[in-house]
Amino acid sequence: MASTPEGIVKDKVKKVLAKYGDELDALWVVPSGMGSPTLDCIICYRGHHIEVETKAPGKLPTPRQLITMEKKEKAGAKVFVIDGDIGCARLDDYLAGIKAGLVEKR
């Protein structure tokens, strides 16, 4: 059980991802200050590359995170910033669209 506001959001995202079973692979990154900057969660689902940055409700990405997001999007990833239920619903809708064949690969 999460004890921080951002941790609560991460738990909500994990519940969304769990709905998609074995076809979805999610790597939750634990930053150590080494290597290249990355976002909180790297997802592969039916050949789609998705990345998620979770934030405490109302918080925004840092300038460094914005640079990382731009880099990921240029490389073809779909990026979500999620700070609560609305962001989780958007991610769920996107994944459901992939499952239904409505979302083309980037």
Task: Name these PLM-found stretches.
Residues 1-106:
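Catalytic phosphate/metal-binding cores of nucleic-acid and nucleotide-processing enzymes, i.e., regions
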